[in-house]
Amino acid sequence: MATVASALRDEGFGATVTYSRKLFLPLTQLCRDVCHYCTFAKTPKKLGAAYMTVEQVLEQVREGERLGCKEALFTLGERPERRYRAAREALEQMGFTSTLEYLAHVAGRVLAETSVLPHINAGCMTDEEIALLRPVSASMGIMLETASDRLGEKGMPHYGSPDKVPARRLETIDRAGAAAVPFTSGILIGIGETRRERVESLLALRQLQQRHGHLQEIIIQNFRAKPGTQMAESPEPDLQELVWTIAIARLIFGARMSLQAPPNLSPGVLPQLIAAGINDWGGVSPMTPDYVNPEAPWPEVERLTRETAQCGKFLHQRLTVYPRYVRDSATWLAPEVRSRVLAHCDGEGMPREDSWLTGSGRGLPNRDREWLERAGQLSAPLNISPAIATVLDRASSVQGANELSVADIEVLFSARNDDFAAVCRAADQLRQQRCGETVSYVVNRNINYTNVCYFKCQFCAFSKGKLSENLRGRPYDLSAEEISRRACEAWERGASELCLQGGIHPEYTGQTYLDIVHTLRRATPGAHIHAFSPLEVWQGAQTLGVTLAEFLQRLKAAGLDSMPGTAAEILDDTVRAELCPDKINTAQWLEVMEASHRVGLRTTATIMFGHIDNYQSWARHLVSIRDLQRRTGGFTEFVPLPFVASESPIYLKGRARRGPTLREALLMHAVARLVFHGTIDNIQASWVKMGVEGVQACLHAGANDVGGTLMNETITRAAGAQHGQEMSPQAFEQLITAAGRRARPRNTLYGDADPAQLRRARQARPLQPPENTPASRYEREKLVTDIIATA
């Protein structure tokens, strides 16, 4: 049975075993129940104070925060004020009428003043009490222990404990499900129950799970006899009983339920517990004891990591709220909690493990740097999980890469530890095979002609309306003369490419975009005009009442040479519905790209990731790009654009993550290299998003291009990035050489750069201050005829 259970666990969780780094807060050890095995509950005479003070709690939580704890486990006796005068008087003195009211206050302070997330074990609760605690906790729990009324009869362990009546506990679990609370429950074995009663208890929990879907984990806890209790001499369940119960629980709940056994209660036999089907060790504290089982100290995380690895599994930290609930946080978390959880997690719903942020200028975390170095050591053996090994083997051929499914690609994005190193190694080897040791860059200039936009993209800190001047400056709409001046200046400074995009000004039409191209072509006849996202093209065609193909032909005739594949964000309409609901949808974006390719306009392809998306949406995006490229061959490169959060409206509203982790950012480049094997050879790393060190890391994870010098970069800086507005050719070449590669200046379409322009770029004078013409009610003229061409 354990063999089947273990296989089920592997189906659901692969090689990952999780734990939560927590601190244990016994808010009160007074309790009205008298469980015969319990040493947690104390009488007032044995306690210095009825309750921990807020200051004591915060002091411990801040120490736990310093030690890397992400969970504050509040455990307390049930309704002590109904039994003890000391509890009632203490609550009255603090200004509270009940223990749970005080608990809500304390947990709220922890949530507001620290980065640690409260998990609350408050016992049996009413609907009103659950509603009181939901806004101050990421998750809650109550051990069912048993569904057998027999264990509450005289002489049995729950006799005299009104809160241990199974119906009351099941009612609380049911209420929590109705309130959409991520919830923990489980059973306690070895307290006099039969195997049949264990199964009946697990089936009762499964019934509630089928009704609400809120049980994030099931704990199988083995009884430990404790001196000084009525059950001090009772026999403890042996290992065979524990293994049997874990295995039967896995069979009852299936592959996807997280199944936990506390490691401190079974020292020396952890491999047997893994073999029985668990995938989680529960909370492990680096600082506080297990107050419920004080005789059983927590194992050190380092030792737990080693013992887990000996079973062929990777130990990984999780939050108190499990990944699948984080990924649907709008449903499962109160708004007050959701923002705190999203700030802590990655795209899988696991905790961020370092302080690196896109665009922040912070150095690379040692952990990821070490894994990347390990990937580059080809002789270093890697312990690769079977799922990753299978997908990497398929991706090694063009045909196999073209057949990778969304599920296959999700597996690659979930890679951690040795799996992460293996994916980066495979991508780097493929990069070497397809592109050699050169890294290319282009001398170009960004010209963002307006930051006025009538679209309401939730991530955008660049576009300006009348309410956003206090964030990033005043709305502007460049005149034709300023556009022309910037283009001429760019050419004189060695640029071969002019890259133009902007907001969708409500007064702009397709003629506006045609006028911009005419102005640029008159000013700089020799420059490559790389302009207009699919959104601008779609809007331009609509306003002129012509087809996409006709409008694109007009743009091309006016002098447009190629197009950026921006406005893609995430090509998954479930994400776009919240991220950019009024923007073109996935099918429309792909339609513009295909039409562009059909009229002979090459384009880039992009992804903007790390906000409200997940690995499935990333995979869908890559598949959409790959499949279109197989039809048209029109994409020149793929450009991952990690989300910069700090000034983004959706992040400031608490509805998005803080951008991808470094692991995720590197994997996006690596996985793209593998998925686009034989279809898109150029994978570009964005220096304005990743920074110099980040770009160099990407060059060892599948990237072969570092983009453009830019001269003026405003969109990413508006979102809060700190990496500057221009990267000179000399700086690019220093960056590339330091990464052990050879620099190759290029043009937009990946041919060699013009030597004359490159000489100009190396001797470029400082930029003149740009003039951002203030926006007025109507658009400014974009066509001028009295221009003296510079090239």
Model-derived segments and spans:
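Conserved, mostly hydrophobic/aromatic
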Residues: 5, 35, 74, 142, ...
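Conserved Radical SAM active-site core
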Residues: 44-210, 394, 464-627
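Mobile, glycine- and charge-enriched loop segments
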Residues: 9, 17, 21, 31-32, ...
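Conserved short loop/turn motifs at secondary-structure junctions
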Residues: 21-26, 118-122, 189-192, 260-263, ...
